[in-house]
Curated annotation (Swiss-Prot):
Gene Ontology BP terms: adenine catabolic process
Lineage of origin: Bacteria, Pseudomonadati, Pseudomonadota, Gammaproteobacteria, Enterobacterales
Swiss-Prot/TrEMBL keywords: Hydrolase, Manganese
Disulfide bridge partners, by residue number: none
Cofactor(s) essential for the protein: Mn(2+)
Molecular functions per Gene Ontology: adenine deaminase activity
Species whose genome carries this gene: Klebsiella pneumoniae (strain 342)
Enzyme class: hydrolase
Similarity comment: Belongs to the metallo-dependent hydrolases superfamily. Adenine deaminase family.
Enzymatic reactions: adenine + H2O + H(+) = hypoxanthine + NH4(+)
Protein name: Adenine deaminase
Pfam families found in the cross-reference section: Adenine_deam_C, Amidohydro_1
The encoding gene: ade
Description of how the protein assembles with itself and partners: Homodimer.
Amino acid sequence: MSSNAQVRRRAVQAARGESPFDLLLVEAQIVDMATGEIRPADVGIVGEMIASVHPRGSRTDAHEVRSLAGGYLSPGLMDTHVHLESSHLPPERYAEIVLTQGTTAVFWDPHELANVLGVEGVRYAVDASRHLPLQVMVAAPSSVPSTPGLEMSGADFAGAEMETMLGWPEVRGVAEVMDMHGVLHGSERMQEIVQAGLNSGKLIEGHARGLSGADLQAYLAAGVTSDHELTSADDALEKLRAGLTIEIRGSHPYLLPDIVAALKTLPHLSSQITVCTDDVPPDMLLEKGGIIALLNLLIEHGLPAVDALRFATLNAAIRLQRHDLGLIAAGRRADLVVFDSLEKLVAREVYVGGERLAHAGRLLKPIAPAPGVTPPRDTLPIAPLRADDFVLRVQGIRHGVARLRHIRGARFTQWGEVEVQVRDGKVQLPAGFSLIWVKHRHGRHQATPQIALLEGWGELRGAIATSYSHDSHNLVVLGRDADDMALAANQLIASGGGMALAQQGEILAHVAMPIAGMLSDLPAAELARQFRELRDLSSQVADWEPPYRVFKAIEGTCLACNAGPHLTDLGLTDGGSRQIVDPLIACRETPEPTDHNNNPQGA
């Protein structure tokens, strides 16, 4: 990882003036993360290493001299927690985008791939990113599945699997520990997972959403050291005071004004404040940016630019145990980014390992896929579906009335109850209700599809289908029309996964994701165009806006580790009690009606 001994020896000689630099960057304004100063200096580079940071004009001996013309020189930006799969791009295409924005290192939790492919998914993440100019630190996913007993993914990870992955040099720690319930209640599986991380000496990421007081203290006592699931400014401060590294994330921008205001009340900004993207869809990554977009939002909300940059550089390097990164200093890796202004950060030039890789938002040379690495395909072994597969039935009565539990809301769900009419054993959808349908897609059991009532999305006009749904990534369809639901699902089965919208017997939009059912092999610009089109057209199917929130809700609607009801491939689950719940409360038979014109599926 660090420069070899020969390069380091050459750097020592160049720093002393005994030999020339390979590259000399002159007329820079150094953004000093150690002192907070902005100071004029030149930077001499040997190989991939910074050899010297010295007064302007004091050295001219170099094989190449490049003027930065007064630009602000910062260490390369670092993303301390990202699910790269949320970009729906393979690693090399993702790297091509974020490198041009100034991000030179990421900590990748590939638990989406792992939930589909098991340990082989993590191996693919390692092998596909090892050759990249982007520094990719892979984490060993702890949440496969995120909630054992409530869902089935493509694998089950416990202590043995974690020990295997943590033994790989490219794996830098344990990824976010999402099973908070298991940690707090001492489940054997979670004790094994956390202990494997402690034994490895590598970092252990947290997912402490909603934890406070004694439960938060207990979570830290177990060995977890970070959290990116901040819910408010008070939550951020409590977690800082508890000793967690907080990772301010860009996927929840509505929290940023209050978090910045709270941080500005502190007498000292700790090195335990970092930044992450967590999840960024492809069009937003390409058009607005990843970490760079988050830093600009923090600056807009009043955080000094030097502090924002420190969160993404020195603080991130400390957090990720990368002592070769994070500062512009002799002996550090020459991963650097040049900005023309600190009021709005736009990367003018990006250097990785001393080589200029990007200029004015353009990569100077393409990045090839990893040689000899075959992306995993054919991960939806599901036979074609029929409209009859998308009918909600009540067992035990043919005609009558049933009282059912259902899911209310989208991302933050609540339990609801509703009385429905039953005709020929089929539920007549009430006004304002739609269906959510989930089918296991990993071939580990022959489960019948699960189906439940959904309220709070309006009456879906058609269907939305996805094979990318946290965290088990089973096949999920939402809709009100059984024919459209089957059409959208079959489109994904045929393409190997992705997302699709159907309405009135036609596919409105479709993004194919044939790699593990979650990554596309399209060029980034074309994928972004298709994804944007699909998201915009979703407003024709779902009533609520903005469309971005629709897709966040779709992707998280089966996340059984969160509080409230969720539908998984095993049934209707309760995140609080960790139980699978029968949706049927009561039913009674009534005389068969004479009017048979009602639509049993609500289609």
